[in-house]
UniProtKB/Swiss-Prot annotation:
Segments carrying motif Cx9C motif 2: 26-36
Renumbered ranges of motif Cx9C motif 1: 5-15
GO CC annotations, alphabetized: mitochondrial intermembrane space
The gene coding this protein: CMC4
UniProt KW keywords: Disulfide bond, Mitochondrion, Repeat
InterPro entries assigned: CMC4, Cys_alpha_HP_mot_SF
Source taxonomy: Eukaryota, Fungi, Dikarya, Ascomycota, Saccharomycotina
Disulfide bonds: 5-36, 15-26
Name of the molecule in the record: Cx9C motif-containing protein 4, mitochondrial
């Protein structure tokens, strides 16, 4: 898998385009990306990288702000 979480990242782009870039209307797909990225880092280590995922430290902050846990779906 060359770009983990690419499907989720593309879903965000599609959602933002269809909602005139109102990110509040795309919260669910943004959450799905963060959950996917969390699983990616848990499975592959925090030194792994995907162009679709924020760095682990930023991801942890974003998940905390959104009250998400890695097991959410």
């Amino acid at each position: 898998m060359s770009n983990p979480c690419q499907k989720e990242a593309c879903a965000i782009q599609d959602c933002l385009l269809s909602h005139q870039y109102d990110d509040a209307k795309c919260a669910k797909v943004i959450d799905q990306l963060y959950i996917c990225c969390s699983k990616f880092y848990n499975d592959n280590g925090k030194d792994s990288r995907s162009p679709c995922c924020p760095l682990p430290s930023l991801l942890e902050l974003k998940m905390k702000q959104r009250k998400l846990t890695p097991g959410d779906s």
